[in-house]
């Protein structure tokens, strides 16, 4: 049983009666019933055995199935349970219960994720994102998440998924991010970014949020970047810096962008941010920006990495991190790397 799954289950009690319930972990719930910690009904009608369980991908769907099943006459319940001996109970219910309906957009996403879980990849990703509770990571690779987002975008109920924030799982947030990247209308995309960014809680979702559509309105996007940099929220600030790095280091570059990124620190940020703090994730992006700017706009960016002491243009921690990233880059000439090493 995974974090994506919700269950409706049916117990047969000692006197032959049936008890129907909802659970995210049927085995644990069954153990509770058998130990007398379940419902009053099962305590007074023990022992119990599991007659069937139906897997769904939203709590609402599982509880709806429970309610619909409870209202059936006993002979109808027995007929459905008999069918469940030869096929998944959820398929029986989906086919036989009136008004059951099709998957919602949320259920489509969760069902799709459940088909592609990689436990090893889950553990790998959880280690890379210390700000995310590991229980919120199920382990689905990025190409699969992009494919799910493309399918989601074609669904008529996709807007309902894009309104349902925040999503519980990291991968649900990733699908949402990639779906935003498929929006071609500039104004619609801006609204989606503004709705989504306050709920981003890790560097991976922030950095993989597509920005291509923002190039359609470079002037308005710059105004929006100014709002994001001034937001005071870690991943909104980080995203704003990322937009400047990805869209404004070519012919759109202006020297003032360097000053804006240099000033884009969180309120009260320490001189040496803790690796698990919000300040760390903003300052690391600032360092990345200056290393990238050095590769693409060397004359303008170099003074920020060389200046120290009273004439410094960057805080010392970010300056050193930017130098480190630049030295590691294959796009920086050896002669310049040597100069940077002397400036550390």
Predicted regions and their residues:
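GIY-YIG nuclease catalytic motif and its immediate N-terminal context
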Residues: 1-56, 60-77, 81-100
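Alpha-helical scaffold domains
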Residues: 97-344
């Amino acid at each position: 049983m995974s974090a994506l799954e919700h269950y409706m289950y049916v117990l047969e009690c000692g006197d032959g009666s049936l008890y129907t319930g909802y659970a995210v972990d049927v085995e644990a719930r069954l153990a509770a019933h058998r130990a007398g910690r379940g419902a009053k009904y099962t305590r007074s009608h023990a022992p119990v055995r599991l007659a069937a369980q139906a897997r769904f991908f939203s709590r609402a769907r599982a509880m709806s199935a429970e309610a619909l099943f409870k209202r059936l006459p006993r002979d109808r319940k027995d007929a459905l349970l008999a069918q469940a001996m030869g096929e998944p109970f959820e398929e029986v219910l989906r086919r036989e219960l009136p008004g059951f309906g099709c998957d919602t957009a949320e259920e489509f996403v969760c069902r799709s994720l459940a088909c592609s879980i990689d436990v090893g990849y889950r553990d790998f990703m959880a280690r890379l994102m210390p700000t995310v509770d590991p229980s919120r990571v199920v382990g689905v690779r990025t190409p699969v998440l992009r494919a799910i987002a493309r399918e989601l975008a074609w669904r008529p109920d996709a807007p309902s998924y894009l309104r349902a924030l925040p999503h519980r799982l990291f991968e649900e947030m990733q699908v949402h991010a990639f779906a935003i990247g498929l929006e071609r209308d500039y104004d619609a995309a801006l609204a989606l970014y503004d709705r989504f960014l306050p709920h981003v809680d890790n560097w991976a979702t922030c950095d993989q949020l597509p920005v291509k559509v923002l190039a359609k309105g470079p002037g308005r996007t710059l105004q929006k970047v100014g709002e994001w940099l001034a937001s005071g929220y870690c991943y909104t600030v980080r995203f704003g810096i990322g937009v400047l790095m990805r869209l404004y280091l070519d012919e759109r570059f202006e020297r003032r962008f360097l000053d804006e990124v240099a000033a884009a620190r969180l309120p009260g940020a320490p001189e040496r941010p803790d690796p698990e703090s919000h300040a760390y994730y903003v300052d690391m992006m600032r360092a990345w920006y200056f290393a990238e700017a050095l590769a693409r706009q060397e004359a303008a960016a170099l003074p920020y990495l060389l200046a120290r002491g009273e004439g410094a243009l960057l805080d010392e921690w970010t300056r050193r991190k930017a130098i480190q990233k630049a030295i590691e880059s294959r796009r920086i000439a050896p002669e310049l790397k040597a100069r940077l090493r002397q400036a550390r």
